[in-house]
Amino acid sequence: MSNPIVTSLKILASNTAADKGLEVVELKFNPHSKPITIQVQIQKKPKKDVSLDDCAQFSELISETIELSKLINEPYLLEISSPGLGDLLQTDKDFKTFKGFPIEVLFKNNENTKLTKSGLLHERSKEYLLINIKGRISKIPREDVITVQLTSPTG
């Protein structure tokens, strides 16, 4: 069950971003930290680099939007960033852009046990994620993949 505050924050952030030619890649809300933390990752449409100025401008806009919405009635920390190394691959474009890059895949096997594999991203088709592990291609059914994350070349 989704938190209604998170849902509302995602809508506010997405609408605010769209008005500036940006899109929200990810939004995390941590109500248990003091102060509350809201982390928003943005990128330009189509995927272009986001500058520090873009993050600062978006931070100002979304902060004002959150204040006006009265969703959060206590102090909060707002963190705006852009995707970078170590981030999750999610879109088809991500998988095309980072072909050949080192990744770590978290997936479940037939017994529903979570496993990881590390290698180079080879391809993502409609049915499989293919990774190159020491020169051998390993196929993981897409429905079993939980996350795919960029890693450093050393692992």
Swiss-Prot record:
Origin superkingdom: Bacteria
Cell compartment(s), UniProt: Cytoplasm
GO cellular component: cytosol
Major localization class: cytoplasm
GO terms under biological process: ribosomal small subunit assembly; translation
InterPro entries: Ribosome_maturation_RimP, RimP_C_sf, RimP_N, RimP_N_sf
Gene3D superfamilies xrefs: RimP-like superfamily, N-terminal
Transmembrane segments: none
Pfam family, one: RimP_N
UniProt KW keywords: Cytoplasm, Ribosome biogenesis
Role according to the record: Required for maturation of 30S ribosomal subunits.
Family note: Belongs to the RimP family.
Name the UniProt record assigns to this protein: Ribosome maturation factor RimP
Organism: Prochlorococcus marinus (strain MIT 9211)
Lineage: Bacteria, Bacillati, Cyanobacteriota, Cyanophyceae, Synechococcales
